[in-house]
Amino acid sequence: MIRVRGVAKSFPGPLGRHQVLRDIHLDVPEGCLYGLIGPGASGKSVLLKMITGLMKPDRGSLLVGDDEVTTASDLKLQAMRLKFGMLFQNNALFDHLTVYDNIAFPLRRLYHPPEEEVRARVAERLTCVSLAGFEDRMPSGLSGGQKKRVGVARATVTRAPIVIYDEPAAGLDPVTSQKIFDLLRAEQRAANATVVMVSSDLDRLLTVTDRVGMMYRGELIFDGTTAEAQVSEEPRVKQFVHGLTEGPL
């Protein structure tokens, strides 16, 4: 369970403090695939960084399981991050490492298992993302979709119970994007993981998520099931879901 209560965050700007998050309240149940949608600069990625302890809020509470993120020491945060697999939008592959070593990197760095276990885990991940036989390829020889698949394999190789994806299909064509979304859903179901995913592709997000949160100008304007989002009468939610164009959000 991820529980966010009253979280707010601002940053300094040329005209004073700029409020990025405003009194955010949401719950992500254990084993849920939760999607976050919203226009650019609505605070989605900032919220992800706070959930993982990479950024502190100005106020509010963030619970991951029984652990309070906002007051945790650096040592405690380091231990808490073992619960997370992460794939951020700019989380590029290491160009100088093979596909195998890219996927193995978090496993080796965080857990130091025997190399035999590393080989088994990486092989299993490559099979799951349909890249068996790509172990010795370099990132420069991969397509955009293949790179995303390697990123998914790297984010899940440690078998962390919580996985964070920030725009996992950004920049891909529609067919490849759908394949990535279907892969993420299949991975989540197989592991019964708790997943929080940011995406600007609402149509595809709604096909795979259990719950969805919609953000606008730092506020969470909707938090509910995917089915509830599709029938909501809240004007801004309707505009998100149905692509209405009668004026700006």
Residue ranges and their predicted role:
Residues 37-39:
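The feature captures the beta-strand-to-loop junction immediately N-terminal to the Walker
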Residues 52:
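Helix-to-loop junction immediately C-terminal to a conserved catalytic motif
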Residues 68, 115-134:
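Conserved ABC ATPase "signature" region
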Residues 138-142, 146:
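Conserved ABC ATPase signature
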Residues 157-161:
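A short, proline-enriched helix->beta-strand linker immediately N-terminal to the Walker B motif
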Residues 163-166:
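Catalytic Walker B motif of ABC-type/P-loop ATPase nucleotide-binding domains
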